[in-house]
Amino acid sequence: MAAKEVKFGNTARQKMLKGVNILADSVKVTLGPKGRNVVLDKSYGSPVITKDGVSVAKEIELEDKFENMGAQMVKEVASKANDEAGDGTTTATVLAQAIVNEGLKSVAAGMNPMDLKRGIDKAVIAAVEELKKISQPCADSKAIAQVATISANADHTIGEIIAQAMDKVGQEGVITVEEGQALTDELDVVEGMQFDRGYLSPYFINNQESGSVELDNPFILLIDKKISNIRELLPVLEGVSKAGKPLLIIAEDVEGEALATLVVNNMRGIVKVAAVKAPGFGDRRKAMLQDIAVLTGGTVVSEEIGMELEKTQLEDLGTAKRVVITKDNTTVVDGNGDDTAIDGRVNQIKQQMEDTTSDYDREKLQERLAKLAGGVAVIKVGAATEMEMKEKKARVEDALHATRAAVEEGVVPGGGVALVRAASKLAELRGDNEEQNVGIRLALRAMEAPLRQIAMNAGAEGSVVANNVRAGEGNYGYNAGNDTYGDMLEMGILDPTKVTRSALQFAASVGALMITTEAMIADIPQDDNAGGMPGGDMGGMGGMGGMM
Protein backbone atom coordinates (compact mmCIF):
# COMPACT_ATOMS: atom_id res chain seq x y z
CA MET A 1 0.00 0.00 0.00
CA ALA A 2 1.36 3.44 -0.96
CA ALA A 3 2.41 5.81 1.80
CA LYS A 4 -0.08 8.61 2.57
CA GLU A 5 0.30 12.29 3.26
CA VAL A 6 -2.06 13.76 5.87
CA LYS A 7 -2.90 17.44 6.33
CA PHE A 8 -4.90 18.80 9.28
CA GLY A 9 -7.02 21.80 10.21
CA ASN A 10 -6.49 25.13 8.54
CA THR A 11 -3.62 23.86 6.34
CA ALA A 12 -5.93 21.22 4.83
CA ARG A 13 -8.83 23.65 4.41
CA GLN A 14 -6.69 26.29 2.66
CA LYS A 15 -5.41 23.71 0.17
CA MET A 16 -8.97 22.55 -0.48
CA LEU A 17 -10.15 26.16 -0.85
CA LYS A 18 -7.49 26.84 -3.47
CA GLY A 19 -8.81 23.93 -5.58
CA VAL A 20 -12.41 25.12 -5.13
CA ASN A 21 -11.49 28.61 -6.34
CA ILE A 22 -9.51 27.41 -9.37
CA LEU A 23 -12.47 25.32 -10.61
CA ALA A 24 -15.17 27.86 -9.70
CA ASP A 25 -13.26 30.79 -11.26
CA SER A 26 -12.99 28.83 -14.52
CA VAL A 27 -16.70 27.96 -14.54
CA LYS A 28 -18.28 31.22 -13.34
CA VAL A 29 -17.03 33.31 -16.29
CA THR A 30 -19.69 31.51 -18.40
CA LEU A 31 -22.65 32.72 -16.27
CA GLY A 32 -25.35 34.97 -17.71
CA PRO A 33 -26.17 36.44 -21.14
CA LYS A 34 -22.79 38.20 -21.29
CA GLY A 35 -20.88 35.15 -20.03
CA ARG A 36 -17.55 34.44 -21.71
CA ASN A 37 -16.43 31.34 -23.58
CA VAL A 38 -13.96 28.77 -22.28
CA VAL A 39 -11.70 26.90 -24.72
CA LEU A 40 -10.98 23.25 -23.87
CA ASP A 41 -7.95 21.51 -25.34
CA LYS A 42 -8.61 17.99 -26.67
CA SER A 43 -5.93 15.33 -27.15
CA TYR A 44 -7.51 14.59 -30.54
CA GLY A 45 -9.10 16.98 -33.02
CA SER A 46 -9.64 20.71 -32.65
CA PRO A 47 -10.25 22.51 -29.31
CA VAL A 48 -13.83 22.77 -28.03
CA ILE A 49 -15.35 26.19 -27.30
CA THR A 50 -18.10 26.10 -24.67
CA LYS A 51 -20.26 28.20 -22.33
CA ASP A 52 -21.57 25.09 -20.56
CA GLY A 53 -20.51 25.10 -16.90
CA VAL A 54 -20.50 21.34 -16.38
CA SER A 55 -18.37 20.76 -19.51
CA VAL A 56 -15.74 23.16 -18.13
CA ALA A 57 -15.88 21.57 -14.67
CA LYS A 58 -15.41 18.05 -16.05
CA GLU A 59 -12.17 19.07 -17.79
CA ILE A 60 -10.42 20.25 -14.62
CA GLU A 61 -7.90 17.94 -12.92
CA LEU A 62 -5.27 19.58 -10.67
CA GLU A 63 -1.74 18.32 -10.06
CA ASP A 64 -1.77 18.91 -6.29
CA LYS A 65 -3.78 16.07 -4.69
CA PHE A 66 -5.25 18.22 -1.91
CA GLU A 67 -6.24 21.08 -4.20
CA ASN A 68 -7.72 18.51 -6.59
CA MET A 69 -9.94 17.13 -3.80
CA GLY A 70 -11.49 20.57 -3.36
CA ALA A 71 -12.00 20.95 -7.11
CA GLN A 72 -13.56 17.48 -7.40
CA MET A 73 -16.06 18.21 -4.61
CA VAL A 74 -17.29 21.33 -6.42
CA LYS A 75 -17.37 19.35 -9.67
CA GLU A 76 -19.76 17.00 -7.85
CA VAL A 77 -22.07 19.98 -7.16
CA ALA A 78 -22.19 20.83 -10.88
CA SER A 79 -22.77 17.19 -11.89
CA LYS A 80 -25.56 16.69 -9.33
CA ALA A 81 -27.35 19.87 -10.44
CA ASN A 82 -26.99 18.72 -14.05
CA ASP A 83 -28.39 15.23 -13.27
CA GLU A 84 -31.32 16.58 -11.26
CA ALA A 85 -32.46 19.50 -13.43
CA GLY A 86 -30.25 19.39 -16.55
CA ASP A 87 -29.13 22.99 -16.03
CA GLY A 88 -28.02 25.43 -13.33
CA THR A 89 -24.52 23.96 -13.11
CA THR A 90 -22.76 27.33 -13.14
CA THR A 91 -25.19 28.81 -10.60
CA ALA A 92 -24.57 25.81 -8.30
CA THR A 93 -20.79 26.24 -8.62
CA VAL A 94 -20.95 29.98 -7.84
CA LEU A 95 -23.15 29.32 -4.78
CA ALA A 96 -20.84 26.55 -3.52
CA GLN A 97 -17.76 28.78 -3.90
CA ALA A 98 -19.45 31.62 -1.98
CA ILE A 99 -20.56 29.29 0.86
CA VAL A 100 -17.11 27.67 1.19
CA ASN A 101 -15.18 30.98 1.09
CA GLU A 102 -17.43 32.68 3.67
CA GLY A 103 -17.66 29.54 5.81
CA LEU A 104 -13.91 28.94 6.02
CA LYS A 105 -13.36 32.57 7.11
CA SER A 106 -15.73 31.95 10.03
CA VAL A 107 -14.03 28.63 10.90
CA ALA A 108 -10.61 30.36 10.84
CA ALA A 109 -12.06 32.96 13.25
CA GLY A 110 -12.70 30.13 15.73
CA MET A 111 -16.39 29.31 15.17
CA ASN A 112 -17.80 25.81 15.50
CA PRO A 113 -18.09 24.29 11.98
CA MET A 114 -21.00 22.02 12.98
CA ASP A 115 -23.11 24.96 14.16
CA LEU A 116 -22.26 26.85 10.97
CA LYS A 117 -23.45 23.82 8.97
CA ARG A 118 -26.73 23.65 10.94
CA GLY A 119 -27.29 27.35 10.27
CA ILE A 120 -26.65 26.91 6.53
CA ASP A 121 -29.05 23.93 6.39
CA LYS A 122 -31.74 25.93 8.20
CA ALA A 123 -31.39 28.86 5.78
CA VAL A 124 -31.55 26.62 2.70
CA ILE A 125 -34.69 24.77 3.86
CA ALA A 126 -36.42 28.13 4.48
CA ALA A 127 -35.17 29.55 1.15
CA VAL A 128 -36.52 26.57 -0.80
CA GLU A 129 -39.96 27.17 0.74
CA GLU A 130 -39.76 30.85 -0.30
CA LEU A 131 -38.81 29.85 -3.87
CA LYS A 132 -41.88 27.60 -4.03
CA LYS A 133 -44.07 30.52 -2.91
CA ILE A 134 -42.82 32.88 -5.64
CA SER A 135 -42.88 30.17 -8.32
CA GLN A 136 -45.43 30.53 -11.14
CA PRO A 137 -46.68 27.76 -13.45
CA CYS A 138 -45.12 27.56 -16.92
CA ALA A 139 -47.82 26.31 -19.25
CA ASP A 140 -48.00 28.47 -22.35
CA SER A 141 -45.78 28.32 -25.40
CA LYS A 142 -44.44 31.86 -24.88
CA ALA A 143 -43.12 31.09 -21.38
CA ILE A 144 -41.57 27.83 -22.62
CA ALA A 145 -39.79 29.72 -25.43
CA GLN A 146 -38.50 32.32 -22.93
CA VAL A 147 -37.10 29.68 -20.55
CA ALA A 148 -35.40 27.83 -23.42
CA THR A 149 -33.96 31.10 -24.78
CA ILE A 150 -32.43 32.05 -21.41
CA SER A 151 -30.93 28.58 -20.93
CA ALA A 152 -29.49 28.63 -24.47
CA ASN A 153 -27.56 31.82 -23.62
CA ALA A 154 -30.13 34.22 -25.12
CA ASP A 155 -30.41 32.39 -28.47
CA HIS A 156 -34.00 33.10 -29.61
CA THR A 157 -33.97 30.56 -32.47
CA ILE A 158 -33.30 27.72 -30.01
CA GLY A 159 -36.08 28.96 -27.71
CA GLU A 160 -38.59 29.07 -30.56
CA ILE A 161 -37.75 25.63 -31.96
CA ILE A 162 -38.04 23.97 -28.52
CA ALA A 163 -41.42 25.68 -27.93
CA GLN A 164 -42.61 24.42 -31.35
CA ALA A 165 -41.43 20.89 -30.56
CA MET A 166 -43.30 20.89 -27.22
CA ASP A 167 -46.42 22.22 -28.94
CA LYS A 168 -46.30 19.36 -31.44
CA VAL A 169 -45.61 16.37 -29.17
CA GLY A 170 -46.96 17.61 -25.84
CA GLN A 171 -45.12 17.84 -22.55
CA GLU A 172 -44.84 14.05 -22.23
CA GLY A 173 -43.47 13.64 -25.77
CA VAL A 174 -39.89 12.73 -26.52
CA ILE A 175 -37.72 15.46 -28.04
CA THR A 176 -34.32 14.32 -29.27
CA VAL A 177 -31.43 16.49 -30.44
CA GLU A 178 -29.30 15.43 -33.41
CA GLU A 179 -26.58 16.97 -35.54
CA GLY A 180 -28.20 18.19 -38.77
CA GLN A 181 -26.82 18.53 -42.29
CA ALA A 182 -27.99 22.10 -43.00
CA LEU A 183 -26.85 25.54 -41.80
CA THR A 184 -30.18 26.21 -40.05
CA ASP A 185 -32.00 24.31 -37.31
CA GLU A 186 -34.79 21.96 -38.42
CA LEU A 187 -37.66 20.29 -36.59
CA ASP A 188 -38.98 16.85 -37.63
CA VAL A 189 -42.09 15.49 -35.94
CA VAL A 190 -43.14 11.83 -36.05
CA GLU A 191 -46.81 11.42 -35.21
CA GLY A 192 -48.07 8.10 -33.88
CA MET A 193 -45.90 5.27 -32.59
CA GLN A 194 -42.65 4.69 -34.43
CA PHE A 195 -40.14 1.90 -33.78
CA ASP A 196 -36.85 1.07 -35.45
CA ARG A 197 -37.76 -2.07 -37.39
CA GLY A 198 -38.32 -2.13 -41.17
CA TYR A 199 -40.05 -4.57 -43.56
CA LEU A 200 -38.71 -8.16 -43.63
CA SER A 201 -38.86 -8.36 -47.43
CA PRO A 202 -38.68 -5.64 -50.12
CA TYR A 203 -41.43 -7.56 -51.96
CA PHE A 204 -43.95 -6.09 -49.46
CA ILE A 205 -43.33 -2.55 -50.88
CA ASN A 206 -46.48 -1.08 -52.46
CA ASN A 207 -45.36 2.54 -52.91
CA GLN A 208 -42.49 2.35 -55.37
CA GLU A 209 -41.85 6.12 -55.34
CA SER A 210 -41.05 6.30 -51.63
CA GLY A 211 -39.90 2.67 -51.36
CA SER A 212 -42.27 2.06 -48.46
CA VAL A 213 -45.18 -0.16 -47.46
CA GLU A 214 -48.41 1.78 -46.80
CA LEU A 215 -51.39 0.01 -45.25
CA ASP A 216 -54.74 1.77 -44.70
CA ASN A 217 -56.99 0.55 -41.85
CA PRO A 218 -54.98 -2.65 -41.37
CA PHE A 219 -55.44 -5.45 -38.87
CA ILE A 220 -52.32 -5.84 -36.69
CA LEU A 221 -51.24 -9.28 -35.45
CA LEU A 222 -48.87 -9.16 -32.45
CA ILE A 223 -46.99 -12.33 -31.52
CA ASP A 224 -43.97 -12.86 -29.25
CA LYS A 225 -42.41 -15.85 -31.02
CA LYS A 226 -40.87 -16.77 -34.38
CA ILE A 227 -43.20 -17.83 -37.19
CA SER A 228 -41.71 -20.33 -39.63
CA ASN A 229 -44.70 -22.64 -40.28
CA ILE A 230 -47.39 -21.08 -42.52
CA ARG A 231 -50.04 -23.51 -41.27
CA GLU A 232 -50.19 -21.64 -37.96
CA LEU A 233 -51.00 -18.43 -39.82
CA LEU A 234 -53.66 -19.76 -42.22
CA PRO A 235 -56.75 -19.17 -39.99
CA VAL A 236 -55.74 -15.51 -39.47
CA LEU A 237 -54.95 -14.98 -43.17
CA GLU A 238 -58.32 -16.45 -44.21
CA GLY A 239 -60.22 -14.24 -41.74
CA VAL A 240 -58.38 -11.09 -42.85
CA SER A 241 -58.86 -11.97 -46.54
CA LYS A 242 -62.65 -12.32 -46.02
CA ALA A 243 -62.73 -8.96 -44.21
CA GLY A 244 -60.98 -7.38 -47.22
CA LYS A 245 -58.45 -5.47 -45.13
CA PRO A 246 -54.63 -5.49 -45.12
CA LEU A 247 -52.63 -7.22 -42.36
CA LEU A 248 -49.46 -6.20 -40.52
CA ILE A 249 -47.64 -8.96 -38.64
CA ILE A 250 -45.32 -7.88 -35.81
CA ALA A 251 -43.47 -10.96 -34.53
CA GLU A 252 -40.10 -11.94 -33.04
CA ASP A 253 -39.27 -13.06 -36.60
CA VAL A 254 -40.99 -14.43 -39.71
CA GLU A 255 -38.78 -16.75 -41.72
CA GLY A 256 -38.56 -19.62 -44.19
CA GLU A 257 -41.76 -21.05 -45.62
CA ALA A 258 -43.99 -18.60 -43.72
CA LEU A 259 -42.24 -15.50 -45.12
CA ALA A 260 -42.14 -16.93 -48.66
CA THR A 261 -45.89 -17.71 -48.58
CA LEU A 262 -46.74 -14.21 -47.30
CA VAL A 263 -44.67 -12.64 -50.10
CA VAL A 264 -46.40 -14.79 -52.77
CA ASN A 265 -49.90 -14.02 -51.39
CA ASN A 266 -49.07 -10.31 -51.31
CA MET A 267 -47.71 -10.24 -54.88
CA ARG A 268 -50.74 -12.13 -56.23
CA GLY A 269 -53.10 -9.75 -54.44
CA ILE A 270 -54.79 -12.56 -52.48
CA VAL A 271 -54.19 -10.70 -49.20
CA LYS A 272 -52.37 -7.42 -48.70
CA VAL A 273 -49.82 -8.21 -45.99
CA ALA A 274 -46.50 -7.03 -44.51
CA ALA A 275 -44.30 -8.39 -41.73
CA VAL A 276 -41.81 -6.68 -39.40
CA LYS A 277 -39.75 -7.82 -36.44
CA ALA A 278 -40.89 -6.72 -32.99
CA PRO A 279 -38.80 -3.87 -31.50
CA GLY A 280 -36.37 -4.39 -28.62
CA PHE A 281 -35.03 -7.54 -27.00
CA GLY A 282 -36.02 -9.81 -24.11
CA ASP A 283 -38.34 -8.29 -21.51
CA ARG A 284 -38.24 -4.89 -23.24
CA ARG A 285 -39.61 -6.50 -26.44
CA LYS A 286 -42.52 -8.03 -24.50
CA ALA A 287 -43.26 -4.65 -22.91
CA MET A 288 -43.18 -2.84 -26.27
CA LEU A 289 -45.45 -5.44 -27.89
CA GLN A 290 -47.88 -4.88 -25.03
CA ASP A 291 -47.64 -1.09 -25.62
CA ILE A 292 -48.56 -1.59 -29.30
CA ALA A 293 -51.41 -3.91 -28.25
CA VAL A 294 -52.84 -1.25 -25.91
CA LEU A 295 -52.43 1.45 -28.57
CA THR A 296 -54.17 -0.59 -31.29
CA GLY A 297 -56.76 -2.40 -29.15
CA GLY A 298 -55.28 -5.84 -29.85
CA THR A 299 -53.91 -8.73 -27.79
CA VAL A 300 -50.37 -10.10 -27.83
CA VAL A 301 -50.60 -13.75 -28.90
CA SER A 302 -48.37 -15.46 -26.37
CA GLU A 303 -48.07 -19.05 -25.20
CA GLU A 304 -47.31 -17.67 -21.72
CA ILE A 305 -50.98 -16.71 -21.38
CA GLY A 306 -52.24 -19.85 -23.13
CA MET A 307 -52.98 -18.32 -26.55
CA GLU A 308 -52.14 -20.21 -29.73
CA LEU A 309 -51.66 -18.68 -33.16
CA GLU A 310 -53.93 -21.28 -34.85
CA LYS A 311 -56.83 -20.30 -32.59
CA THR A 312 -56.42 -16.53 -32.97
CA GLN A 313 -59.63 -14.70 -33.94
CA LEU A 314 -60.04 -11.34 -35.70
CA GLU A 315 -61.14 -9.86 -32.34
CA ASP A 316 -57.61 -10.52 -30.99
CA LEU A 317 -56.03 -8.35 -33.69
CA GLY A 318 -55.33 -4.65 -33.24
CA THR A 319 -56.36 -2.00 -35.77
CA ALA A 320 -55.04 1.41 -36.79
CA LYS A 321 -55.97 4.12 -39.26
CA ARG A 322 -52.68 3.82 -41.13
CA VAL A 323 -49.30 2.07 -41.01
CA VAL A 324 -46.18 3.16 -42.93
CA ILE A 325 -43.14 0.85 -43.09
CA THR A 326 -39.78 1.89 -44.53
CA LYS A 327 -36.50 0.00 -44.76
CA ASP A 328 -35.62 1.04 -41.18
CA ASN A 329 -38.79 2.16 -39.39
CA THR A 330 -42.43 1.27 -38.79
CA THR A 331 -44.96 3.99 -37.87
CA VAL A 332 -48.44 3.19 -36.54
CA VAL A 333 -50.73 6.23 -36.87
CA ASP A 334 -54.03 6.58 -34.95
CA GLY A 335 -54.26 3.22 -33.22
CA ASN A 336 -57.84 2.27 -32.30
CA GLY A 337 -57.04 1.39 -28.68
CA ASP A 338 -59.28 2.25 -25.75
CA ASP A 339 -58.37 5.66 -24.25
CA THR A 340 -58.84 4.39 -20.69
CA ALA A 341 -56.50 1.45 -21.32
CA ILE A 342 -53.91 3.79 -22.88
CA ASP A 343 -54.11 6.15 -19.86
CA GLY A 344 -53.69 3.16 -17.53
CA ARG A 345 -50.62 2.00 -19.46
CA VAL A 346 -49.16 5.54 -19.40
CA ASN A 347 -49.60 5.74 -15.61
CA GLN A 348 -48.01 2.30 -15.21
CA ILE A 349 -44.92 3.41 -17.19
CA LYS A 350 -44.72 6.65 -15.15
CA GLN A 351 -44.71 4.57 -11.96
CA GLN A 352 -41.90 2.38 -13.34
CA MET A 353 -39.92 5.55 -14.16
CA GLU A 354 -40.23 6.69 -10.54
CA ASP A 355 -39.18 3.28 -9.20
CA THR A 356 -36.17 2.59 -11.44
CA THR A 357 -32.64 3.56 -10.36
CA SER A 358 -31.06 3.08 -13.80
CA ASP A 359 -30.71 6.17 -16.03
CA TYR A 360 -30.71 3.93 -19.12
CA ASP A 361 -33.97 2.23 -18.10
CA ARG A 362 -35.52 5.61 -17.30
CA GLU A 363 -34.58 6.91 -20.75
CA LYS A 364 -36.11 3.86 -22.46
CA LEU A 365 -39.28 4.16 -20.36
CA GLN A 366 -39.51 7.86 -21.32
CA GLU A 367 -39.32 6.85 -24.99
CA ARG A 368 -42.11 4.29 -24.53
CA LEU A 369 -44.20 6.87 -22.68
CA ALA A 370 -43.79 9.38 -25.49
CA LYS A 371 -44.81 6.87 -28.13
CA LEU A 372 -48.01 6.16 -26.23
CA ALA A 373 -48.85 9.66 -24.99
CA GLY A 374 -47.57 12.13 -27.55
CA GLY A 375 -45.09 11.56 -30.30
CA VAL A 376 -41.45 12.08 -31.10
CA ALA A 377 -39.85 15.35 -32.24
CA VAL A 378 -36.30 15.52 -33.56
CA ILE A 379 -34.44 18.85 -33.47
CA LYS A 380 -31.67 18.82 -36.09
CA VAL A 381 -29.06 21.39 -35.11
CA GLY A 382 -27.57 23.35 -38.01
CA ALA A 383 -24.18 25.08 -38.02
CA ALA A 384 -21.39 26.15 -40.38
CA THR A 385 -18.54 24.22 -38.72
CA GLU A 386 -18.24 21.07 -36.62
CA MET A 387 -16.89 23.10 -33.69
CA GLU A 388 -19.93 25.40 -33.73
CA MET A 389 -22.23 22.37 -34.15
CA LYS A 390 -20.93 20.68 -30.97
CA GLU A 391 -21.18 23.88 -28.92
CA LYS A 392 -24.69 24.64 -30.18
CA LYS A 393 -25.93 21.07 -29.68
CA ALA A 394 -24.83 21.21 -26.02
CA ARG A 395 -26.78 24.48 -25.58
CA VAL A 396 -29.92 23.00 -27.19
CA GLU A 397 -29.74 19.99 -24.85
CA ASP A 398 -29.34 22.31 -21.83
CA ALA A 399 -32.29 24.42 -22.96
CA LEU A 400 -34.42 21.30 -23.41
CA HIS A 401 -33.66 20.09 -19.86
CA ALA A 402 -34.42 23.55 -18.45
CA THR A 403 -37.74 23.66 -20.29
CA ARG A 404 -38.79 20.26 -18.93
CA ALA A 405 -37.85 21.44 -15.42
CA ALA A 406 -39.93 24.62 -15.90
CA VAL A 407 -42.99 22.64 -16.97
CA GLU A 408 -42.53 20.35 -13.96
CA GLU A 409 -42.14 22.87 -11.09
CA GLY A 410 -42.87 26.28 -12.62
CA VAL A 411 -40.67 29.37 -13.07
CA VAL A 412 -39.22 32.16 -10.93
CA PRO A 413 -37.71 35.54 -11.96
CA GLY A 414 -34.32 34.88 -13.57
CA GLY A 415 -30.95 36.61 -13.39
CA GLY A 416 -30.36 35.57 -9.77
CA VAL A 417 -33.32 37.71 -8.58
CA ALA A 418 -35.32 34.80 -7.11
CA LEU A 419 -32.50 33.90 -4.69
CA VAL A 420 -32.10 37.57 -3.64
CA ARG A 421 -35.86 37.84 -2.97
CA ALA A 422 -35.89 34.55 -1.01
CA ALA A 423 -32.89 35.73 1.06
CA SER A 424 -34.47 39.12 1.84
CA LYS A 425 -37.62 37.37 3.17
CA LEU A 426 -35.45 35.41 5.64
CA ALA A 427 -33.74 38.41 7.28
CA GLU A 428 -35.49 37.58 10.59
CA LEU A 429 -34.57 33.85 10.54
CA ARG A 430 -32.68 32.80 13.70
CA GLY A 431 -30.84 29.66 14.81
CA ASP A 432 -30.40 28.09 18.27
CA ASN A 433 -27.20 30.03 19.03
CA GLU A 434 -25.05 32.86 17.65
CA GLU A 435 -22.85 30.56 15.57
CA GLN A 436 -25.91 29.11 13.81
CA ASN A 437 -27.00 32.70 13.13
CA VAL A 438 -23.63 33.30 11.45
CA GLY A 439 -24.27 30.18 9.31
CA ILE A 440 -27.71 31.52 8.32
CA ARG A 441 -26.34 34.97 7.41
CA LEU A 442 -23.47 33.35 5.52
CA ALA A 443 -25.91 31.30 3.38
CA LEU A 444 -28.17 34.33 2.74
CA ARG A 445 -25.15 36.40 1.67
CA ALA A 446 -23.99 33.58 -0.65
CA MET A 447 -27.43 33.61 -2.33
CA GLU A 448 -26.56 37.01 -3.84
CA ALA A 449 -23.42 35.59 -5.52
CA PRO A 450 -25.08 34.50 -8.83
CA LEU A 451 -26.60 37.99 -9.35
CA ARG A 452 -23.23 39.66 -8.61
CA GLN A 453 -21.43 37.31 -11.02
CA ILE A 454 -23.96 37.87 -13.84
CA ALA A 455 -23.48 41.64 -13.40
CA MET A 456 -19.67 41.36 -13.33
CA ASN A 457 -19.62 39.21 -16.49
CA ALA A 458 -21.69 41.95 -18.18
CA GLY A 459 -19.12 44.60 -17.17
CA ALA A 460 -21.23 46.11 -14.35
CA GLU A 461 -20.28 46.51 -10.68
CA GLY A 462 -21.71 43.51 -8.79
CA SER A 463 -22.24 45.28 -5.44
CA VAL A 464 -24.05 48.26 -7.01
CA VAL A 465 -26.38 45.97 -8.99
CA ALA A 466 -27.07 43.80 -5.92
CA ASN A 467 -27.98 46.91 -3.85
CA ASN A 468 -30.31 48.22 -6.58
CA VAL A 469 -32.08 44.85 -6.92
CA ARG A 470 -32.35 44.47 -3.13
CA ALA A 471 -34.01 47.90 -2.97
CA GLY A 472 -36.71 46.76 -5.43
CA GLU A 473 -39.59 44.35 -4.84
CA GLY A 474 -41.14 41.29 -6.47
CA ASN A 475 -39.86 40.55 -9.97
CA TYR A 476 -37.75 43.73 -10.19
CA GLY A 477 -34.23 42.86 -11.32
CA TYR A 478 -31.24 43.52 -13.55
CA ASN A 479 -31.27 42.58 -17.25
CA ALA A 480 -27.59 41.98 -18.02
CA GLY A 481 -28.40 41.53 -21.71
CA ASN A 482 -29.09 45.25 -22.23
CA ASP A 483 -27.94 46.76 -18.89
CA THR A 484 -31.43 47.83 -17.71
CA TYR A 485 -33.62 47.26 -14.64
CA GLY A 486 -37.26 46.20 -14.66
CA ASP A 487 -39.79 43.38 -14.22
CA MET A 488 -37.91 40.17 -15.05
CA LEU A 489 -41.04 38.21 -16.03
CA GLU A 490 -42.18 40.96 -18.42
CA MET A 491 -38.70 41.04 -19.97
CA GLY A 492 -38.93 37.27 -20.45
CA ILE A 493 -36.05 36.48 -18.07
CA LEU A 494 -37.20 33.33 -16.28
CA ASP A 495 -35.47 30.46 -14.51
CA PRO A 496 -37.10 27.08 -13.83
CA THR A 497 -37.83 26.77 -10.10
CA LYS A 498 -36.39 23.25 -10.12
CA VAL A 499 -33.05 24.48 -11.53
CA THR A 500 -32.69 27.26 -8.93
CA ARG A 501 -33.81 24.98 -6.08
CA SER A 502 -31.45 22.13 -7.08
CA ALA A 503 -28.49 24.49 -7.49
CA LEU A 504 -29.01 25.92 -3.99
CA GLN A 505 -29.59 22.56 -2.28
CA PHE A 506 -26.59 20.79 -3.82
CA ALA A 507 -24.26 23.79 -3.35
CA ALA A 508 -25.21 24.08 0.32
CA SER A 509 -24.91 20.33 0.89
CA VAL A 510 -21.36 20.04 -0.47
CA GLY A 511 -20.31 23.50 0.76
CA ALA A 512 -21.34 22.70 4.35
CA LEU A 513 -19.47 19.37 4.21
CA MET A 514 -16.29 21.15 3.11
CA ILE A 515 -16.56 23.67 5.96
CA THR A 516 -16.63 20.77 8.45
CA THR A 517 -13.48 19.12 7.00
CA GLU A 518 -10.72 18.70 9.62
CA ALA A 519 -8.26 16.32 7.90
CA MET A 520 -7.32 15.34 4.34
CA ILE A 521 -5.44 12.23 3.24
CA ALA A 522 -3.78 11.63 -0.15
CA ASP A 523 -1.13 9.36 -1.67
CA ILE A 524 2.42 10.68 -1.52
CA PRO A 525 3.47 11.24 -5.17
CA GLN A 526 5.95 8.60 -6.36
CA ASP A 527 9.28 9.74 -7.78
CA ASP A 528 9.24 8.15 -11.25
CA ASN A 529 13.05 8.25 -11.59
CA ALA A 530 13.58 6.23 -8.41
CA GLY A 531 11.78 3.20 -9.82
CA GLY A 532 13.79 3.00 -13.09
CA MET A 533 15.66 -0.20 -14.07
CA PRO A 534 19.43 0.01 -13.40
CA GLY A 535 21.20 0.32 -16.73
CA GLY A 536 24.34 -1.69 -15.80
CA ASP A 537 22.61 -5.10 -15.70
CA MET A 538 21.78 -5.01 -19.40
CA GLY A 539 25.47 -5.24 -20.30
CA GLY A 540 25.39 -8.98 -19.67
CA MET A 541 23.15 -9.41 -22.72
CA GLY A 542 26.24 -9.03 -24.90
CA GLY A 543 27.38 -12.49 -23.83
CA MET A 544 24.31 -14.05 -25.45
CA GLY A 545 26.34 -14.37 -28.67
CA GLY A 546 28.28 -17.25 -27.12
CA MET A 547 25.05 -19.27 -26.89
CA MET A 548 24.85 -19.67 -30.64
Swiss-Prot record:
Kindly indicate where the leader peptide sits in this chain.
none
What is the annotated localization of this protein? Cytoplasm
State the reactions this protein catalyses: ATP + H2O + a folded polypeptide = ADP + phosphate + an unfolded polypeptide
Query: Record's superkingdom?
Result: Bacteria
Mainly resides where?
cytoplasm
A cellular component annotation (GO) from this entry: cytoplasm
Q: Which UniProt keywords apply?
A: ATP-binding, Chaperone, Cytoplasm, Isomerase, Nucleotide-binding
Q: Which of this chain's residues are annotated to bind ATP?
A: 30-33, 51, 87-91, 415, 495
Task: Identify the InterPro entries for this entry.
Answer: Chaperonin_Cpn60_CS (IPR018370), Cpn60/GroEL (IPR001844), Cpn60/GroEL/TCP-1 (IPR002423), GroEL-like_apical_dom_sf (IPR027409), GROEL-like_equatorial_sf (IPR027413), TCP-1-like_intermed_sf (IPR027410)
One Pfam match, by short name? Cpn60_TCP1
Q: What class of enzyme is it?
A: isomerase
EC number(s): the record gives: 5.6.1.7
Q: Which GO terms describe its molecular function?
A: ATP binding; ATP-dependent protein folding chaperone; isomerase activity; unfolded protein binding
Family affiliation: Belongs to the chaperonin (HSP60) family.
The record's function comment reads:
Together with its co-chaperonin GroES, plays an essential role in assisting protein folding. The GroEL-GroES system forms a nano-cage that allows encapsulation of the non-native substrate proteins and provides a physical environment optimized to promote and accelerate protein folding.
Q: How does it assemble?
A: Forms a cylinder of 14 subunits composed of two heptameric rings stacked back-to-back. Interacts with the co-chaperonin GroES.
Q: What is this protein called?
A: Chaperonin GroEL
User: From which organism does this entry originate?
Assistant: Idiomarina loihiensis (strain ATCC BAA-735 / DSM 15497 / L2-TR)
Lineage of this protein's species?
Answer: Bacteria, Pseudomonadati, Pseudomonadota, Gammaproteobacteria, Alteromonadales
